[in-house]
Amino acid sequence: MPIFVNTVYCKNILALSMTKKFKTIIDAIGGNIIVNSTILKKLSPYFRTHLRQKYTKNKDPVTRVCLDLDIHSLTSIVIYSYTGKVYIDSHNVVNLLRASILTSVEFIIYTCINFILRDFRKEYCVECYMMGIEYGLSNLLCHTKNFIAKHFLELEDDIIDNFDYLSMKLILESDELNVPDEDYVVDFVIKWYIKRRNKLGNLLLLIKNVIRSNYLSPRGINNVKWILDCTKIFHCDKQPRKSYKYPFIEYPMNMDQIIDIFHMCTSTHVGEVVYLIGGWMNNEIHNNAIAVNYISNNWIPIPPMNSPRLYATGIPANNKLYVVGGLPNPTSVERWFHGDAAWVNMPSLLKPRCNPAVASINNVIYVMGGHSETDTTTEYLLPNHDQWQFGPSTYYPHYKSCALVFGRRLFLVGRNAEFYCESSNTWTLIDDPIYPRDNPELIIVDNKLLLIGGFYRGSYIDTIEVYNHHTYSWNIWDGK
């Protein structure tokens, strides 16, 4: 056990030992100890006050007092008062610090703090942080605050159980707070409020003071509106937290510049939010993702995927964002949504696929094509299942087709076209597009199914086609 010596105090010990000795029995938490009260009263004002002997005509040679200190910490302080030496290790340092603060023994206070800062451990960071606030120990407070912010996800349960409004605010307003996105902070504050049953006023103050609303998803914004009981939330122009700040994005940067960075990415959308996933950056495949709200014209952070991806496909389903296939791991699948700590790996596809067509009906995810130019297999994943299953084969291979659900049917269109009906579990042929296409897109405009874009034999197809559900055929769209 490390020993720390107060050399100045040691010089005065000999003089103290020559004074008249008065024995005192101290009853502490967990035991008692007999001390030389004369020496101990010289140590600090606390002991002078608490060991003061009441005046009587016949003084007893031994007095007895009760102190609200644990016996182990008190013993260490008594040994220090006799020898000028204090024994500190990771097991006793926190309790000894608290006892030395209560007893005003400055050498032990600063020695304990220095020991904690040099050999900092996660298991006592929350308690040290609380002491830093309670007793105004600025260096301990600063160090523990930064540590908790950095390890926030690991310490979440301890924080909820122990922190009041002030303790929480100091952590959550930090730029160093290590969270995957700002929605996570909103979800955490709600959990803290429910668990701790704090006053609603504290919750409102916390939301207004710490949430960076300009980086919230629509889901996060709706949660804040619900808390604040309003239709419009406060404006915030703070910089993003360091944990979800993109190193390749300069601030401020407009949406067009951000979109240009995500070259050859996968894209999908939920409402007004477009998700840009993976692609090619700095001459390599990357695992970055970002969301862009084209209504509010701001970007929303997304944590990096578990795997880099090029030629993958994204699809919203089951209130999550799924990313399927692509290089370099064409059978891999993962999912995430705002407020989640990280992407979660899902069951692997039965076949490797790049740029597959993916759609979801009733929370069942269907994957078609993307394997080879002759492959007609399909596979699907049921909610809460851990394995993909083969579905009914398509009539045509769909190596570079696209898929979209329209009118309770799953349309699969590229060079050829067909649709899937879930109730009958069958594919039905429809007329091929007027202009066959590779990698086109299907969109819905005014309750019409439109086929746009794509390439054929190296040329871009700029003609838009509209589906006629009466004739099962395609017509050139005139914009009406």
From Swiss-Prot:
Induction: Expressed in the early phase of the viral replicative cycle. Residues 10-90 form the BTB domain. Belongs to the orthopoxvirus OPG047 family. Kelch repeats lie at residues 273-319, 320-363, 365-408, 410-447, 448-480. Might have a role in the suppression of host immune response. Gene3D superfamilies: 1.25.40.420, Kelch-type beta propeller, Potassium Channel Kv1.1, Chain A. The lineage of its organism: Viruses, Varidnaviria, Bamfordvirae, Nucleocytoviricota, Pokkesviricetes. This is Immune evasion protein OPG047. The keyword Repeat applies. Residues 125-223 form the BACK domain. It comes from the Viruses. Keywords: Kelch repeat, Repeat.
